[in-house]
A protein has these predicted regions:
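Structural recognition of alpha->loop->beta junctions
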Residues: 114-142
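A generic structural signal for alpha->beta connector loops
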Residues: 96, 129-130, 154
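Conserved Radical SAM active-site core
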Residues: 1-3, 11, 17-18, 35-115, ...
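Local cysteine-cluster metal-coordination motifs and their immediate loop/turn environment
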Residues: 24-37
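Hydrophobic pocket-lining residues within nucleotide cofactor-binding pockets
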Residues: 26, 74, 138
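Conserved small/polar residues in nucleotide/adenosyl-binding loops
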Residues: 159-160
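C-terminal substrate-binding/active-site "lid" region of AdoMet-derived donor-dependent transferases
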Residues: 145, 149-150
Length: 161
């Protein structure tokens, strides 16, 4: 898996101050996506053990509320497979921090349903490691900049999956 960016103090993508990881790779290609450069699975840098350690160190300060995953698309199966071991490390080291994930996919159709576009052998485990999932593709016609933690009115937030 590659990643496009790590923000070590982000206040736009979840409650409180967060560390944000933008993964690479997305097959959705939403119209007017704010991060279209991350559609390419080869964009950015490889997500290595050293990268994991960098993110884990950034999570250490007490003022950091948690980790947010976005992209690209964290729920692309190859990204899920790469992220599950890392998320276990986050949970072990920082059980008090929460984990948010933004996905253009939908929980019920794409992640939980057999044959869903993002369902794979690690999806249930991946979801169990999240505290908040914000699902639903960005829809330009539903764009609403007044919404908190969403770019359009269609995404749904799920907590404690």
């Amino acid at each position: 898996m590659n990643y496009g960016e790590i923000k070590k103090t982000d206040i736009a993508n979840g409650i409180g101050v967060r560390v944000t990881l933008f993964v690479s790779g997305c097959t959705r290609h939403c119209k007017n996506c704010f991060n279209a450069e991350t559609w390419d699975f080869n964009y950015g840098k490889p997500f290595t053990k050293e990268t994991e350690d960098e993110v884990l160190a950034a999570l250490a300060p007490g003022f950091i509320n948690g980790l947010t995953l976005l992209g690209g698309e964290p729920m692309e199966p190859q990204n899920q497979r790469a992220l599950v071991p890392f998320l276990h490390r986050v949970r072990k080291l920082y059980p008090e921090k929460d984990i948010w994930c933004y996905s253009g996919s939908t929980l019920e159709t794409d992640m939980l349903k057999d044959g869903g576009r993002n369902r794979c052998e690690v999806t249930d485990e991946f979801l169990s490691l999240l505290d908040v999932l914000v699902d639903g593709a960005f829809v330009d016609e539903l764009k609403d900049i007044s919404l908190r933690f969403r770019g359009s009115s269609n995404p749904v937030s799920y907590t404690h999956l």
